[in-house]
Amino acid sequence: VLTEEDKARVRVAWVPVSKNAELYGAETLTRLFAAHPTTKTYFPHFDLSPGSNDLKVHGKKVIDALTEAVNNLDDVAGALSKLSDLHAQKLRVDPDNFQFLGLCLEVTIAAHSGGPLKPEVLLSVDKFLGQISKVLASRYR
């Protein structure tokens, strides 16, 4: 459960992410596909090379969806309800991949932070992304 302090930290940490959604999204997907190559199977029609337009467009969609969750931290499940249904019922994405994506996003955020992330910021962002993973995986029952 995110505390009020966690929510405040996530909102502050998210400002550069949301302002640079295409960049953060594409870099996160590039890291995901490099570290977890089996995730590529969900994108057979994409150009998965780093910096490709496909990664930029889809990466922006990912960050925009997460920004919606940041804007609704008191109802993340509601904010991601349609996305959760899509990934569970239509796309049938392995729910473990949501955790992998979250970890890759943490690395991307850290890489752009200009220095080490403060432990309390990393903890809050990690809790938020863990909550996202749980919400997205919740429709798999």
Curated annotation (Swiss-Prot):
Q: What tissues has this protein been observed in?
A: Red blood cells.
**Chain residues that bind O2:** H58
- Record domain Globin: where: 1-141
Keyword Heme assigned: yes
Please give the PROSITE patterns that the UniProt record associates with this protein.
Answer: GLOBIN
Supply the SUPFAM superfamilies for this chain.
Globin-like
Query: Per its UniProt record, what InterPro entries does this chain match?
Result: Globin (IPR000971), Globin-like_sf (IPR009050), Globin/Proto (IPR012292), Hemoglobin_a-typ (IPR002338), Hemoglobin_oxygen_transport (IPR050056), Hemoglobin_pi (IPR002339)
Please report which protein family the annotation says this sequence is part of: Belongs to the globin family.
Q: What is this protein called?
A: Hemoglobin subunit alpha
Species in which this protein is naturally found: Microcephalophis gracilis (Graceful small-headed sea snake)
Q: Top-down, what is the taxonomic lineage of the species of origin?
A: Eukaryota, Metazoa, Chordata, Craniata, Vertebrata
